[in-house]
């Protein structure tokens, strides 16, 4: 199913309604399309949120996805205890293992993912069979090369995966 929205408010209302009607944990990506939706949110989200992917850059780099969500936590729109992300600036296998154990216990029903400029989502640039829910990649075709991301296996367990694409040549947004 494909939906086209005339403006960001329509998309925001639609996305918030999906989140509100679903109390299960959510997987949400970073990226500009997602930021454009969530920067206008004014209602508290009580769901557990897993950040789908993170770039391995310095903790306060503008390239980090979690910094945007930290702002939502400070505004008390997301509960800190309900936000799960990879917070280290480098790959740490022990930390990744702990994060996997936490993620494996959760039953995600919905994923809300922005589509990147080259069609990628959640730092997944190629099909990979990963046995764990969250893994590291060292060869991303986009900067930076080193990232952590949710596996396709874990994503496929969601009942609903929403892809948000910003159509730059048009003045509307789409969900695919």
Predicted features and spans:
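N-terminal glycine-/serine-/threonine-rich phosphate-binding loop
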Residues: 1-26
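Conserved acidic residues
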Residues: 24, 109, 159
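Glycine-rich beta-strand-to-loop/alpha-helix junction loops that act as flexible
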Residues: 27-33, 113-117
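Active-site histidine-anchored catalytic micro-motif
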Residues: 39, 50-60, 121-125, 160-164
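Short, conserved loop/helix-junction motifs that constitute active-site signature segments
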Residues: 41-48, 77-78, 153-159
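Ligand-binding beta-strand-loop-alpha-helix segment within the catalytic cores
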Residues: 45-112
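Class I SAM-dependent methyltransferase SAM-binding "motif I" and its flanking Rossmann-like core
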Residues: 111-113, 117-153
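ATP/nucleoside-binding phosphotransfer catalytic cores, i.e., glycine-rich phosphate-binding loops
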Residues: 157-176
């Amino acid at each position: 199913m494909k939906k086209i929205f005339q403006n960001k408010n329509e998309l925001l209302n639609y996305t918030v309604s999906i989140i509100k009607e679903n109390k299960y944990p959510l997987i949400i990506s970073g990226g500009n399309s997602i930021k454009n939706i969530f920067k206008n949110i004014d209602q508290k989200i009580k769901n557990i949120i897993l950040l789908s992917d993170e770039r391995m850059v310095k903790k306060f780099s503008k390239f980090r996805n979690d910094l945007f969500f930290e702002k939502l936590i400070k505004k008390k729109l997301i509960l800190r205890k309900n936000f799960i992300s990879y917070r280290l600036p480098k790959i740490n296998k022990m930390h990744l293992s702990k994060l996997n154990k936490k993620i494996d216990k959760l039953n995600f029903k919905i994923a809300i993912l922005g589509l990147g400029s080259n069609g990628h989502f959640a730092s997944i640039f190629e099909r990979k069979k990963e046995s764990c829910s969250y893994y590291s990649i060292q060869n991303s075709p986009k900067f930076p090369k080193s990232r952590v991301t949710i596996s396709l296996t874990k994503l496929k367990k969601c009942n609903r995966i929403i892809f948000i694409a910003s159509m730059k040549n048009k003045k509307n947004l789409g969900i695919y």
